[in-house]
Amino acid sequence: MTEEKSTNKKNSLFEWVKAIIIAVVLALLIRAFLFEPYLVEGTSMDPTLHDGERLFVYKTVRYVGEFKRGDIVIIDGDEKNVHYVKRLIGLPGDTVQMKDDTLYINGKKVSEPYLSENRKEAEAVGVKLTGDFGPVKVPEGKYFVMGDNRQRSMDSRNGLGLIDKKRVAGTSQFVFFPFNEIRKTD
């Protein structure tokens, strides 16, 4: 009977170890291919996203599907553990231009409702929200991104340049922290 108890304890321990290993492997696979939490650092996406907020990034679009204009994307930086959160403005093949505080894609005026709060603040002090630039032709395999806080964002206009598709980690769908600020991101 003692041998039987010893065997049962070994089997029980083996089952626990096996369950823990499976859980760790599943967690790593989910984080690598499905979604991952990211920290928003800085004010370049204000007022849409705020410094210190945490969001989930869906990585599946990187492997299956296409990024869409207006998506909030996470970009892997050149350095390890450096990421940028920006809005995807120009797709491969697009021509992007900003003129008189109005965005044009392929010569057509594009509405940017997510900028309304920042635009009001800029108009109140008599400045443009976004300086004129372009036209910029986005090559195949690249994206043009900008932060929603146009006056304080390093993006495709001024430092990040055009973004390779392989550097886009995924899209943000919602903020999960702080808990009193849980919401979808648009």
From Swiss-Prot:
Keywords: Cell membrane, Hydrolase, Membrane, Protease, Transmembrane, Transmembrane helix. One of its GO terms (molecular function) is serine-type endopeptidase activity. Belongs to the peptidase S26 family. The chain crosses the membrane at residues 20-40. It is found in: Cell membrane. GO terms for biological process: signal peptide processing. One of its GO terms (cellular component) is plasma membrane. It is a single-pass type II membrane protein. Its main location: membrane. This is Signal peptidase I. PANTHER family: CHLOROPLAST PROCESSING PEPTIDASE, SIGNAL PEPTIDASE I. InterPro entries: LexA/Signal_pep-like_sf (IPR036286), Pept_S26A_signal_pept_1 (IPR000223), Pept_S26A_signal_pept_1_CS (IPR019758), Pept_S26A_signal_pept_1_Lys-AS (IPR019757), Pept_S26A_signal_pept_1_Ser-AS (IPR019756), Peptidase_S26 (IPR019533). CDD domains: S26_SPase_I. It comes from the Bacteria. It catalyses: Cleavage of hydrophobic, N-terminal signal or leader sequences from secreted and periplasmic proteins. Gene3D superfamilies: Umud Fragment, subunit A (2.10.109.10). Residues 41-186 are extracellular. Residues 1-19 are cytoplasmic. It is an enzyme of class 3 (hydrolase). Its EC number is 3.4.21.89. The active site is at S44, K86.
